[in-house]
Amino acid sequence: LSVMKLIDSPGKIKEGSIIFDGKDITNYTENQMSNIRGNEIAMIFQDTMTSLNPVFKIKDQMVEVIERHQKLGKHKATERALDMLRLVGIPEPERRINSYPHEFSGGMRQRAMIATALSCSPKLLIADEPTTALDVTIQAQILDIMRDISVKTGTSIILITHDLGVIAETCNDLIVMYGGMPMEMGSVEDIFANPQHPYSQGLLKSVPRMDREQK
């Protein structure tokens, strides 16, 4: 939320900087940020049931974002929305785009959220626990989609998660956080193989391993 400058009052950014595309966006006005949010920086929130408006169809919510940032008419924006639904693997997109969020399964809602977030081809996608409420099969599908889209579109992804398995499968670089502060950072391979901070070591030791002898 800090990156998007969406912290509710009285919360505020007291110090530091957020450099995006070579510029410190902490100094941006609300008008400047509104042009970036959903356009250059997009976010997938953890709870899809509350992130999607239950009284509007998927089409209405996707088209609004595309019209706002891409300056397209409704017809072109709808075509773009359909293309994105196809990209994330939603079957029968021409029919499902007219569904309400409650008519989608958890995995389908997450796909719709990803499609909406990527509809304006952002440079950065922030994914906050995008697979937490999903079973392992759907989780794997969602992670595959995110990886493929990152490769195809060049979108960078910041993945916020507590799941070390997801990190190992998906990420290149890792920052271990505790109490809102970075404890350790480096490549996933380096930290998993040789964690330096006690908190990182504790996290990795907490993961059950089949190759570890039980005492």
Task: Write out the residue ranges for each language-model feature.
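Short catalytic/signature loops enriched in Gly
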Residues: P10, P91-R95, S187-K215
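Conserved ABC transporter NBD signature motif
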Residues: I13-D24
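Conserved ABC ATPase "signature" region
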Residues: K23-D24, E64, K76-R95, L204-K205
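ABC ATPase NBD coupling module
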Residues: I25-A42, D60, R68, D190-P195
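A short, proline-enriched helix->beta-strand linker immediately N-terminal to the Walker B motif
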Residues: S119-K123
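A short, surface-exposed alpha-helical micro-motif characterized by mixed small hydrophobic
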Residues: I167-E169
